[in-house]
Amino acid sequence: MIAIFKREIRNYLKRPLFWVGVLLVIYGVFNATSPYLTTHYLTTGEKIINDQSNTSVEGEVYEGYIPATPEKHREVWHEKVKIKLTDVFGLTDSEAQNVIEKLESMNLKEAYAYLEQEYDWYGARYLYEDSTYYKGTAEEINAYLDKKLEDKTFSFYYARKFADFAGLYMVFFAIIMLAVLFLQDTKKHTYELLHTKPVTAGKYVMGKVSAGFTICLLVLTILNILFWVLCRIYTKDSGFEVRLWDFVASTVLYILPNMLMIVSIYTLISLIFKNPLPGVPLLILYMVYSNLGGTNAEGVYGYWGKPLAIMVRFPGQLFDTTPPPMACLL
C-alpha cells in the first residue's frame, strides 16, 4: 500500500494541471473573501464612501452597514414611510408626521394593516425588510466591531468565510483532480505496478483513497497558511487578533469531512463502473444538491444545510455567520 500511496502522490505533484488547479483555488478564494479583509476601525468623522443606498436588507461592515437594533430599525422604517407618504401618496409633511405618530403606538402587524387599509399600501412590510441594515457613523461602526470582537477573534469570523469559499472551490478541484488520478489506472500503469510490487485489491484501493485524501489535505494546508498570513498582513493596522487555529478548526470541521466523502465516492464509482468518469456528473449533481436553498418551518427561504451534503456554506454577513442546521450531520 505504501508503494501505491507514494506513486499516486508523485503522479499528482508532477502534473502541471495540479498546480494550475491550486492557483485557481487560491485566486477564487481570495477574490471572494478579500473584501472582508478591508474591515477596519474608522477614525473620528471618517465615512465609507460608495454609491449604495443608506439602508439595505443586508450589508457588510466594510461597506459601512451595520444591523439595526429593533428600535433603530423601527426609526429608520418610519423615516422611509414618511418620505413615501409625502412623495407617492401626496400627504403634506404634517399629515405624514401624524401618520407616523399613530404607527409608533402600533406593533408591526397593526402598522402594516393600518397602511393597507388607509392607503391601500401593501409594500410597507418590504420597506421594513429593506431597513434591516443601515449605514452607521464611525462611532456606531466602531462600537459594533468592539461588540463582535469582544469574545471572538476577527479570524474566527473570517475563517468561516474562508471555509465557505475554500470548500466550494475545493469541491471543483477534487472532482477534476481525482478523475485525472483514477484515469491513470490504465492497463499500462496497472501492469507495471503488479509486476513490481505484490499488492492486494484492498491495499490498492486503500492506497488510492489515502493518496487522494492526502493531496487534498496538502492543498488545504497551503490555503490555511497562505490566508492566515494574508489576514495578518491586511489587518495589522486594525489591531485585530488573527489566529492560525481558527483557520485550522474551520477546515477540519467544515471541509475535511467533505474531501474524504468525495474521495470515497470516487473510489466506489471507479470500482463499480471500472471508470471514474461517471463520478464527475454525479458529484456535480451532488454539489448542486448540497448548495440548494430551501424553506424552513416559518416559510423563510435560505440556505439551511442538507443531510450528508458535501459543502457547508456560510452565506450571511461576516459577523453574523452561523453553522447551518444539520451541519453536524456532515
Task: Write out the residue ranges for each language-model feature.
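Hydrophobic alpha-helical transmembrane segments
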Residues: 5, 18-22, 248-253, 280-282, ...
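Helix-loop-helix units of permease transmembrane domains in multi-pass membrane transporters
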Residues: 3-4, 179-218
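Secretory targeting signals
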Residues: 24-72, 113, 122-176, 206-276
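Transmembrane alpha-helix boundary/hinge residues in polytopic small-molecule transporters
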Residues: 189-190, 264, 280
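Aromatic- and glycine-rich beta-strand/loop motifs that create alpha-glucan
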Residues: 1-25
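Terminal transmembrane helical anchor/hairpin motif
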Residues: 35-80, 146-154, 277-330
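Membrane-anchoring hydrophobic segments
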Residues: 154-160, 185, 192-194, 301
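Extracytoplasmic loops/domains of multi-pass membrane proteins
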Residues: 72-131
